[in-house]
């Protein structure tokens, strides 16, 4: 929970993780971290009036040959109505001159 607040403070809008979920495996479906990331009141499933452009991509695979660093992210999201949609993130390395 504290980590997700820090991620929000940093201004992260597109979160990509190599885990099955950003929430605890057994949280009784509360999805606390998802709610924090999307500014949804805990215990509620009502989305705020403002549309969030934040995304979470779980279960990504990044080969070991990809170095830590700064990248541009191009994310392809299928036009899909629902609470989850498949995506295809592509990263491009940035060189700081």
Describe the role of every protein-language-model region:
Residues 1-97:
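Active-/binding-site microenvironments in catalytic and ligand-binding cores
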């Amino acid at each position: 929970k504290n980590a997700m607040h820090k991620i929000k403070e940093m201004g992260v809008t597109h979160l990509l993780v190599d885990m099955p979920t950003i929430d605890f495996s057994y949280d009784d479906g509360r999805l606390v971290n998802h709610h924090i990331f999307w500014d949804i009141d805990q215990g509620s499933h009502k989305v705020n009036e403002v549309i969030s452009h934040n995304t979470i991509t779980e279960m990504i695979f990044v080969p070991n040959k990809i170095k830590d660093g700064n990248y541009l992210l191009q994310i392809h999201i299928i036009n899909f109505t629902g609470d989850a949609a498949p995506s295809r993130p592509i990263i491009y390395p940035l060189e700081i001159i």
